[in-house]
A protein has these predicted regions:
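N-terminal hydrophobic or amphipathic helices/low-complexity stretches enriched
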Residues: 16-70, 182-183, 253-254, 473
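Second-shell loop/turn segments in exported
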Residues: 19-22, 38-48, 63, 78-80, ...
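Extracytoplasmic/secreted proteins, especially bacterial periplasmic and envelope-associated proteins
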Residues: 23, 27-30, 34, 48, ...
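Noncatalytic luminal/extracellular "stalk/propeptide" segments of secretory-pathway proteins
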Residues: 41-141, 148
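Extracellular/luminal Protease-associated
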Residues: 99-202, 259, 283-286, 390-391
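Metal-dependent peptidase/peptidase-like ectodomains
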Residues: 192-193, 199-219, 258, 310, ...
Length: 477
């Protein structure tokens, strides 16, 4: 038996093993420099950059004591992708039998096969695509307005509804809010989608000025109700199509109890790869802030949680693919979860976290679930941080991976300082965002990101403890 003084000495000199070192800016920077290096080629899905990125994430998670939680006992969750790049096309329009000239530069088309033809098809105006009842779209080329009233389904869903109604081609009429040259340039770079996603045989874009000219030839206009038009169209559309498999990465930190429940952290690993043509001074979009920073934070949060006492619930760490193409990887996980979706008590997304200074208030995207809000508020207070309650960041809710999970009923949030100052965030979005100069350089701001990483560790401990937080029944945010 130890004498009292000797016991006191041992207690005072013993290391506090349950107190892991806080995450520092240098910890985040190490990962960002690697993931945003030119050797990773901009981390495009399906590229050599993907292999380097997913291998790196697996190594880092395994080194922190996590185990694989993907498909078939692996770290990976594969998903089938198709990439389409528009080629040449020919289009002929007639209104009441009279040819109507629409300039080639005023229409952009893509097919779901390498060559698609449409011969003397009827043209139907679909309005904004929200009132389709009573209109026959079978075999037709449908014109649909991109803009719709607030509360309408997203454009992607409205196009899907027209495809389900039998339209052979769907041409989206763009508004004047974004210049046509920018819209068509983005379209002609191509798109990426799930190989299983149904698309019209032919999809396309047309500026409002050209669509108005076409409808005027038929005695109609863009304000008309949905109806068949006295217009016929023939098309031949060529498209380059590339099918490949890309991967989410999924790891698990085992909890201390058999709760059958999971907390989920996620961050998208993908970016745009070679985003400029050959001969450009810098061809690679490295995505340092978007979103090597989020992946770096997720890795370090995994380490912080693994280094301390294990909370009762398991904690999953999901690095998603193809976020930049429409939350595809997160949507795939929501539709094909590697754990029962109802077992996920909350999902915390990490995206674009390296822009705010230390001391920034904490904003929350996805508030509205009382038990979750209370857990966040208590954690923020315990960390000596202050909440930003102006709700300006709510406009971003559908632009991040958490939205794919929230739609599936999982309580999904983003918590941090990078979107508490919308002016600061907008400066990034209007500058380096999705550009080759989003690099691991002196413009990275990581002291605020480190604060948010430590907040996420504390929040993770709270949310992974059933005694501190229980998911309410009835779905997500």
């Amino acid at each position: 038996m130890f004498k009292p003084l000797a016991l006191l000495f041992l207690l005072l000199s013993a290391p506090l093993a349950a107190q892991p070192a806080p995450i520092a800016p240098a910890d985040l920077l190490r990962h960002i420099r690697i993931l945003a290096d030119d050797s990773f080629q901009g981390r495009a899905p399906g590229s050599e950059g993907e292999r380097l990125t997913t291998d790196y994430i697996v190594r880092e998670l395994a080194a922190r004591g996590l185990e694989p939680a993907g498909e078939n006992g692996t770290w990976l969750q594969p998903l089938p992708i198709v990439e389409t790049v528009p080629g040449a096309s020919e289009v002929r329009w007639t209104a009441r039998g009279v040819p109507v000239e629409i300039a080639a530069e005023d229409i952009a088309l893509s097919g779901n096969e390498e060559v698609k033809r449409l011969t003397d098809a009827p043209v139907v105006f679909a309005g904004d695509g929200t009132r389709l009842a009573g209109v026959d779209f079978h075999g037709a080329a449908a014109l649909v307005l991109a803009q719709a009233p607030a509360g309408s389904p997203p454009l992607r869903q409205r196009v899907r509804a027209l495809t389900d109604a039998g339209a052979a081609a769907v041409i989206v009429v763009t508004g004047a809010d974004v210049p046509w040259n920018l819209i068509v340039a983005g379209f002609r770079r191509g798109s990426t989608r799930l190989d299983s996603e149904p698309l019209p045989n032919i999809a396309g874009l047309m500026p409002a000025r050209a669509a108005q000219r076409l409808l005027a030839a038929a005695g109609s206009d863009l304000g008309a109700a949905p109806a068949a038009l006295p217009i016929r169209v023939s098309m031949e559309v060529h498209t380059d199509i590339h099918r490949f498999t890309t991967n989410n990465v999924v790891g698990r930190l085992r909890g201390s109890g058999a709760t059958g429940e999971n907390l989920l952290f996620l961050a998208h690993w993908d970016h745009f790869g070679f985003c400029r043509p050959e001969g450009a001074p810098d061809r690679i979009c490295n995505g340092a802030v978007d979103n090597a920073s989020g992946v770096a934070m997720m890795i370090e949060v995994a380490g912080g949680l693994a280094a301390g006492p294990r909370p009762p619930r398991d904690i999953l760490f999901l690095a998603t693919t193809a976020e930049e193409e429409g939350l595809i990887g997160a949507g795939w996980f929501a539709a094909h979860p590697t754990v029962p979706l109802g077992s996920i008590v909350a999902a915390i997304n990490m995206d674009t976290v390296a822009i705010q200074p230390a001391g920034s208030p904490v904003a929350v995207i996805g508030r509205g679930i009382p038990a979750l809000d209370a857990a966040i508020d208590a954690t923020v207070a315990a960390m000596g941080r202050r909440l930003d309650n102006d709700d300006e960041a709510a406009e971003l809710v559908q632009r991040q991976d958490g939205w794919a999970l929230a739609r599936a009923g999982v309580p999904a949030i983003m918590v941090g300082g990078s979107f508490s100052d919308m002016a600061l965030l907008n400066r990034f979005l209007e500058g380096r965002y999705h550009e080759p100069n989003d690099q691991a350089d002196g413009e990275l701001v990581l002291d605020g990101a480190a604060e948010d990483a430590n907040l996420s560790v504390a929040l993770g401990r709270r949310l992974a403890d059933p005694a501190a937080y229980r998911r309410a029944t009835g779905g997500g945010s």
